[in-house]
Amino acid sequence: TITGDQFMGYTFYSDFGSILRPTSASVQEVLPGLSTSSVKRAYVAFDLASEAENGQNLESNKIYDIILRSSYYANYAIPTYRTVKYTAASDTLITKNQRVQEINKDIWAINGYVNALVTINYQQNKAFSMNTYYTEEDIDVANNTLNLNLYYNSHSENPTAQGQSVISFKLPEEVIHFNQFSTDSIKLVLNAITGYDDSSLTKVGECKVALKDFSEPMY
């Protein structure tokens, strides 16, 4: 998860707990468009700036100075989407919903986002949208559980291609602000329509998420 800017410098909060601070020179070389883009999540390849530190076993909550490396061909943005509150029965979220071809059940949530590996069918050169939503019924305070429901619209009746990507959905901070959960972590369940014969949302994965991780890290 990316925080900061070109003036104050960037800080990358890894999903493994370590905190990475890239040199300004390597950001300009490898990710020159970062200052003008809305990238919030990314894969990055890097070396540690200090040769005395071991890059194989980075410690959680420890800050490391890094140098981004373009030669590894591994720097790219992760698609990120909003989570919205679904309030109107006449909304098109369900009526235009397309089935997700496949979704990895090993989802994880940290640093303000829930993440999953998703495979979808689409038609090339046709725009598609993706999002997660929740309703009041999806918030179960008594059992410390939140359901998020995944949908996407390929805007195509005849998909011609298939794609796979890690995607990130912004966790809804208002859920923890307006609900009194009894623990400091809750169960997060991700539902989606998968396959071709399902007619309703189906649970595809779940994970534990700390309430503090509903907010993005503060720079």
Where are these regions (language model features)?
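First exposed extracellular module after export/assembly in secreted or surface-exposed proteins
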Residues: F7-Y219
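A short catalytic or substrate-binding loop motif that flags glycine-/basic-rich loops and adjacent residues
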Residues: G4
